[in-house]
């Protein structure tokens, strides 16, 4: 005699998933990839994450110290991009106040705390200037602006880019043959963090923790 009740009709929707034999992958995931490409990738990843020698650790520690970042930040960027950090981009508005003097000349006044940090920086430094924050620069003044800035920062600034978005930042780095993977941003606030992230920079360092 057949069953008078349709047990299949009253089954919970998740019963089939619960009864299904689990896969052999981690956490009931897909099966382990045994392909040649996967093996090569796992081997390369294992070598990249291998514990470095004491000499390498010291070299990386000194580099991080020169750049004003932590050892962890340096190595994280290295593992994510395969490149060593060596350059920094800072918004001009964060580094200095720009105004016109009584005779119309451009005056750059470094912010005291930033000037001291720039003096300690041991990498390549670039500034990104928002055209709207600089008082109506002419083309001639813009061409001479780097020299004016470097008089205020003791020649530490390598180049200045103009704009306020990721395209302007990447364009400045490309014009100076600097890979963006080797560059981090020193900024303050969410706006600078979003700018660095959208430009693909591996690290955005808050100025409050720079060299601290």
Feature annotation, model-predicted:
Residues 1-37, 41:
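Eukaryotic charged/polar low-complexity linker/IDR segments
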Residues 117-122, 149-154, 172-181:
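Flexible, charged surface loops at secondary-structure boundaries
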Residues 128-134, 160-164, 186-190:
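Structural motif
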Residues 139-143, 209:
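Extended low-complexity, polyampholyte segments enriched in Ser/Thr/Pro and acidic residues
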Residues 169-212:
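Extended, charged low-complexity segments
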